[in-house]
UniProtKB/Swiss-Prot annotation:
Residues 12-28 have a biased composition (Pro residues). High-affinity potassium transporter. One of its GO terms (molecular function) is potassium ion transmembrane transporter activity. This is Potassium transporter 23. GO terms for cellular component: membrane. The chain crosses the membrane at residues 127-147, 174-194, 261-281, 296-316, 326-346, 380-400, 407-427, 442-462, 499-519, 525-545, 556-578, 584-604. It comes from Oryza sativa subsp. japonica (Rice). The gene is HAK23. Belongs to the HAK/KUP transporter (TC 2.A.72.3) family. The lineage of its organism: Eukaryota, Viridiplantae, Streptophyta, Embryophyta, Tracheophyta.
Amino acid sequence: MDDDDSGIQEEPAPPPPPPPPPPPPPPLRRLLTATRSGGSRWVDGSEVGSSESAPWSLDGDRSLRLSVDSAASAGGASGGGGGGGPLSRASSGAFRRRFGKQPRRVDSLDVEAMSVRGAHGHSSKEISMLSTVAMAFQTLGVVYGDMGTSPLYVFSDVFSKVPIKSEVEILGALSLVMYTIALIPFAKYVFIVLKANDNGEGGTFALYSLICRYAKVSLLPNQQRVDEDISSFRLKLPTPELERALSVKESLEKNPVFKNILLFLVLMGTSMVIGDGILTPSMSVMSAVSGLQGRVPGFGTDAVVIVSILFLVLLFSVQRFGTGKVGFMFAPILALWFINLGTIGIYNLAKYDISVVRAFNPVYIYLFFQTNGIKAWSALGGCVLCITGAEAMFADLGHFSVKSIQVAFTAVVFPCLLIAYMGQAAYLMKYPFAVERIFYDSVPEILFWPVFVIATLAAMIASQAMISATFSCIKQAMALGCFPRIKIIHTSKKVMGQIYIPVMNWFLMVMCIIIVATFRSTNDIANAYGIAEVGVMMVSTALVTLVMLLIWQTNLFLVMCFPVIFGSVEFVYLTAVLSKIQEGGWLPLAFSSLFLCIMYTWNYGSVLKYQSEMRGKISLDFILDLGSTLGTVRVPGIGLVYNELVQGIPSIFGHLLVTLPAMHSTIVFVCIKYVPVPYVPFEERFLFRRIGQKDYHMFRCVARYGYKDVRKEEHGFFEQLLVETLEKFLRKESQEMALEASAMAVERDDVSVVSDIPSSPVEAGDLHVPLLSDQRLGDGTQTFITEGNTPVLPTSSISEEDPSLEYELESLREAIASGFTYLLAHGDVRARKESFFTKKFIINYFYAFLRRNCRAGTATLKVPHSNIMRVGMTYMV
């Protein structure tokens, strides 16, 4: 039979004896961390013996990773296509300890996600060429509106500072514009900055979250090792670049000054983007409307201001309907606009003076500065307007792909803008005094009205892009704890990024009206416009440089070239625009300072409040001493205790025990936590653990969200999912106990994770998807627990062998029938008496003012007021 089974024919020699059976797998234990003495430790606290392998493996791409398999698969190192021998246990342990320091205390939530499906990366789908072209067409209407409308006002602002005396001024200004576009948007953003994306997300906060994942630089101390397993987290083999990256990482983590500087840069960049949201609509709309001057008799400055204000009111009034209602028109209008720019530019080149192509010679930049001196330096403030909106290429990356943005800029935007500016320069070579309205004067008479209509629509679309970017920045800042809670309305059921913030919308409208009515001139607004743009670019340069050092591990020479080349150019432009502070440049600085103070104060107060909660948390021993009744009467019902702690029992629970005459039979501590990733997959969102013994009926639930995730769940559906998940948790816990008992395992670690994954793929952009899934948890749902791929026992057999499970499930059903109660803290944050005056002023007045006027936390839960119970607390920070 053995010969037949193995397919061996008759041979004179007897078959070799079968190999000895492999040793049985070790007990269900998991490797967690390295001990202080250099050894390894299991989750249950026992040391790894000398015969057990270190928790490392070397895979084919020559990268180190922490093994999440059972001990049977964790031993040794396996070589791959990349070759290379196994690392020694001592060197790998020291390297791991240096890359990511372990928490002092082993908490179950630090281990639970080690078996999360997809923890080591998510496969990226290749986008077809047709899809890339279609996406590139869409970027014209969303990304490039601001930059595309810059020909309306660039030359008029430049030559308002440098009068045209000869062709040197025209060719020099044209050469400056051409090389500025080629250097900043084309070289910096298209080829470098776009690659520094956070899983396809761009913007200042995306860079910050990317840095926070590789170094613990967030000031809010709620980071956990478990968060590293949300997305791919790999350690490369030791190299000089990696050693340098580790040194940078350690410096950032150890020095609180560096953390504050990094946060300050991020908040300043975000504040500048909000400033752009105020200045862009004012500048774009007023530039488009000013084309009627000289064409319509009696249409003077007052008429321009009034019509611009009417357009602005209309623009902000339709925001509540969402960009999706008119978004399909954006790309065709902007495509038509770029075609007009290129066509009119070619017409002017052919008709007036094609010799302006000499501006490709950068020597005219030198002649421009040599001839005009300080005036030429002042003209840089107008020249920088040609790259307004360049940051949108990176900020709006989440809606498109890197390749689509690169294709659109390289194939359409870049050539059309160059031709448009050359056409205007050719017109000025013949009519040097037509600088005030150079764009409309260079348009052929027969095309004026069609071009005016398209220009006005393009200006409003450009304004829409910056308004939407402002809304997105506010939402991201709120998610990362850097902005007070305000109302956010999702205007699309399919597109997650389409949001509307009423308070910010009307604030922007009022500010835009004030700016137009006060400045009354595009040249004066341009003085303020440039500061915000250059400020955002310099912040992105600093953050991308840090990404190169810490994450990309680029060669040091190339790293230094990036800030030296681009940073020096941006610094020169910054000095030019800062010289216009008295002429209107103070405006963006005032707006940025206001929002910077708001965001930094909110973050500062939130960090102090969290630290105060950590100091006041209740010990588990105290809860155990109270017994299963918790020192009070347990009545049927489920109490959801909302708190911000990821570990420990919050102090609000102690207040509840003292204040309430009875306590719910089932207690779930719910922590809503935002992690520095754009999206958390639904199957990785929830972490569960049991607190105390079974008869306590107390659980912890940590719900993790990315800074671009949407929380839009009705309380009834959320409660249903929570209960079903809790039931799954209890069954898997019982199953785990049965398996360990049958395997004669060592003392069981009572930690489990339930990941409920829908049988059909879930799209992150669908707002109908709730916290876990949009399906009832049933037979078609896969479940995973921490102890690897353990076999699943039938529910019936488990319930027969474990009566305590049926008792606990019956108690849960009784609690469900009695209903849910949401228990929240209504806290007052006060500075301690011994604090400095500045801290008292910030916390007791400014932060308290923001807390009183921000949106209440209960408003985001969408729970009937009859189901909410709030307990007053005072946090001394």
